[in-house]
Structures are given as structure tokens and as C-alpha cells.
Amino acid sequence: MGVFTNLFQDEIDFIEKKYKIKILEIKNIDNGILNSNFYIKTKNKKYILRIYEANRTIDEEKQELILLDRIVDFIPVSIAIKNIDNEYISIFNNKKFALFEYIDGNSITKIDTHIIREIAIYLGKLHSFTKDISFEKYNRKTRIDLDFYYNEIKKSEIDFKFKNELLNSADKINGFDFSILPSGVIHGDIFPDNVLLDDYNNIKVIFDFNESYYAPFIFDIAIVINFWIKINGFDFFTENNLIRDFLNYYSKYRKITKEELKSLDIACKKMALTFIFLRIYKEKIDNSYQKAISIQEKSYLDLIKLIKNK
């Protein structure tokens, strides 16, 4: 999330009018590096206000919000609230706004078998549903794009730790064709940060589908394996048990193919590099942390362990 764009009083007035609410409190939400988000409190309810920062069309942004409405009955998600014009997105001062239900919950502080099985089930349900959605129906762009970040970093003159090693690693996986694998709409950013738990440590909400796009399912699978399991430095036995459990419970809802299993290691490396390069780009080239009004900084160095000794 994070905040890159100021919210001015005339825009607050516009939001109040468009959604028939009276805002009592607004706070910046610091975590994340792709959109501007605000916590909003009214007398009776709480909301999340998103200001879109991506260079996407209104129709592309609507695709995400329509998807949330379609999956809310079997996946716990926060849906967008339509304005008085029955539209998901409101436009004012050349800014695009969306208002979401606020769902209170607890951040994930510990990864265990129960959590891994739950995210596996929900991800399997999501992919089982979206396998029937074509690229033509969900043709929105994503900013989680290894090729873009690789090219921007390679042509720049910036230097940083592990630069040559990272670029060489990307070169090695560049020739693999993931498009031959089963595809549909994926979450694209399914990190523990985008999940909240209830008081019994069950998943209460999965949010931030704003980078969802049509892609091979193996990318979401690799993100979970990397950023829910491998990043935590479990011992060999625990790590492999968690990965096995994740794949088994996922397969109860969408069976993973042999071809996907064969490509799993290279997919994990690709997704690790994707988010490493995203962070490098945001920090070193785009200067997002300097430009942000309010943001929680995240270093690419925290992710290097995912590609070392592979």
C-alpha cells in the first residue's frame, strides 16, 4: 500500500458526497509500494480508500473489482463499494478512487501448518474458478513484471550489491516458456502482508488484488512457497513438509499438473527475482521511498536468501 498522493479537502468532500458518508478520521496506510491507501473512519463504519497509481484504464481497474464481487461467496475478500452513480470507481481532479470495506483482523506473525493449508485451499479455489476466465476477459496490465524491471535496471548506470549476480540469474531463466502451463487470473501479490487472521488464527480476509492478472497459476504457487515458507529459514524437514502440505491442499481444488511440478523450482526463482528487482527499481531508479508521503521501506536485500545457493 503506502501513500504517494496527497488527499486534499475538496477530494475528501467529493468522496463524502459520492459515497454518502461523513468522514471523521483519515490515516495514511504505510505498507506497500504500488498504490496510495487511506484508512477512513465514519460514525458507524470503517473503510479503505484507494487512489490508483497505475497507468491502467478504468476498464482494466474495474476488472479487479468485478472479480472480487464474483469470488466473495467462497473466498474472504474485501469488496469495493459502489458510489451513488452505481460505479466502482470515482474520478475527481484526474485521480481515480475506490472505496473498500474495512475488515479488521490480525497480521500474520507466525507461519505454521494450519496457515499454509488455509492459504492453499483459498488459492486452489481461486485458480479453479479463474481457469475459465480468458485473457480477453481479463486483459489488465500488471506492474509485477520481471522483464520491465530487468530492462530498466540493466540500462541504468546504478550500482548495488549483487547486481551482476542478480542480472545473470535473470538471464538464466529468461528462456523458459511458462505460457505453456495452465493459466487464469492469479492474485499476483499473495504475500502474508495481504492476509489478515481472526482471533482463532483462521484467515479472515485476503486483500489487495490490484496486481491480479492473467498468468500461469504456477506464479502464485511460487510466491507462496517463496514468501510464506522459504523466506523464513525453516530447517530442511519443516520446509519440505510445509511445501508438501501446501501443494496437497491446493490440489484438492485444482490439481497441479506434472509439467507445473517440473517447473516449480525455476518458477520460484523467477518470482523471487521479480520482487527483488521490483524493490531495486522502486528504491534505486524510481526513488519511491523519497517520493512517498508515507511508506514502510522494504529492502531487496531481505529477499536475497531466496536465490542464494540455487
Q: Residue ranges of each PLM-predicted region?
A:
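A glycine-centered beta->alpha junction motif in the catalytic cores
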Residues: 97-110, 151, 273-287
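Active-site acidic catalytic loop and adjacent metal/ATP-binding pocket
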Residues: 33-41, 48-49, 80, 173-219
